[in-house]
Amino acid sequence: PLSVMMALEMARTGADGDTKQQMGAVLYPGMSAEDGSMVLGRICKSLPDAEGARFHMSDSVWVKTADDVFVPDENFLDTVKTAYDAEVFGAPFDETTCRDINRLVEQETDGMITEILDQIPELAVMYLVNAVAFDAEWETPYDESQIQDATFYAEDGSGQEVSMMYDTTYRYLTMEHAEGFCRAYKEGYDFVALLPEEGLSLSEWLEELDGETFHETIRQENDTMIET
């Protein structure tokens, strides 16, 4: 995910020696870390920002200032500010900092994520925080008659009453051990839902899924009518 990629890239920027080299090799296989970082930067700058589809990303660095236990390298701070437009905050790393980080994430994700921390460990001295939000309108909006209450079942078998959206689509997806569908957002983006076959846990399915298989599945959508 892009959010994880950005957080790890900021961490790589602050690393040195073998650690920095190894992180670059993992993040950017087949290319130099410098080239990979440039590609990542171009991807971030090309994210949609239109009326019908908006992708917002925010980076921040939080540094513990209490007791002067940790002094970050100024070159690192300058780099994350200029290269990633990151905000840098000095904070006491107490309950107020926990609240401030959660508030910033909630703000930057349009309220979709309200909490990422419930407490800050005593030994923590820095947080690299990346918040991502994608907000888009359906190309064909649902009307009220297509929204009904039903039971959603979690992987552990527990059920919860939620509002569900119903539709008929012709964009059916199938792959080994899973099936699903696509539904269009505005500005050329798609919502993709995939459901592992019964008896296969989500973690087991994700362990065998790779990027090439996923993209091939999307490219070969079937023109088959299904109810979603």
Q: Where are the regions that the model predicts?
A:
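Short Gly/aromatic-enriched secondary-structure transition segments
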Residues: 23-27, 142-149, 203-212
